[in-house]
């Protein structure tokens, strides 16, 4: 009887996971590209201007000098994208200056260690300080596998600006269900400990 209850509970958790991941999790759709808004992009060059409005006739508000700098697209207007950086600066950039390459910026107040595994007790492979720009190789629900030069490792999403909290990047379809399953089991176990 106990085995049947455990099996039933696992089936229910799996069913909830399937429903959760098959629902539309997107925000708006951009009228120019058909892509999700908001979404993250990065700069293509070491010299890019953010303008007050969507035209070269508008004054330059900010000048970025760092290739791969992450930006969040908030709106689309013809060839222009309204973007925001991690410091909450907002302006317009021409679409030719941005790329779909996913990068993030470390927002920790101190050095945050990269993890070889996506657990807190994983092997430390290096340390990375705030304001470093990293490539987002892949992301699970709570962790991203990032690279910076020769260093690669897992880091908690809470320390990265440039990825949505529940966003999955380059992870197989079934990995999502496995992660959600184990997260649900852990939550259920914690809940049962309270009784």
What kind of feature is each model-predicted range?
Residues 56:
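Extracytoplasmic Gram-positive cell-surface binding/anchoring modules and repeats
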Residues 10-20:
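Bacterial N-terminal signal peptides
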Residues 23:
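Conserved beta-alpha structural segments and adjacent helices that either
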Residues 1-12:
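Bacterial N-terminal signal peptides that target proteins for export
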Residues 26-52, 63-67, 74-77, 84-87, ...:
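SH3-family beta-barrel domains
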């Amino acid at each position: 009887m106990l085995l049947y209850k455990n099996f039933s509970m696992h089936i229910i958790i799996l069913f909830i996971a399937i429903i959760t991941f098959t629902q539309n999790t997107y925000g708006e759709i951009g009228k120019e590209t058909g892509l999700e808004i908001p979404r993250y992009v990065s700069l293509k060059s070491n010299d890019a201007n953010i303008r007050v409005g969507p035209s070269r006739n508008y004054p330059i508000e900010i000048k970025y000098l760092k290739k791969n700098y992450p930006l969040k697209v908030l709106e689309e207007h013809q060839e222009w994208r309204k973007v925001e950086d991690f410091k909450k600066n907002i302006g317009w950039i021409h679409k030719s200056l941005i790329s779909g390459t996913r990068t993030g910026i470390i927002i920790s107040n101190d050095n945050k260690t990269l993890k070889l595994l996506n657990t807190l007790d994983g092997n430390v492979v290096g340390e990375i300080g705030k304001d470093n720009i990293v490539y987002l190789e892949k992301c699970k629900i709570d962790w991203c596998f990032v690279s910076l030069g020769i260093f690669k490792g897992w880091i908690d999403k809470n320390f990265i600006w440039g990825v949505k909290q529940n966003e999955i990047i380059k992870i197989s379809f079934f990995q999502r269900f496995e992660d959600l399953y184990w997260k649900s089991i852990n939550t259920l176990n914690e809940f049962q400990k309270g009784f």
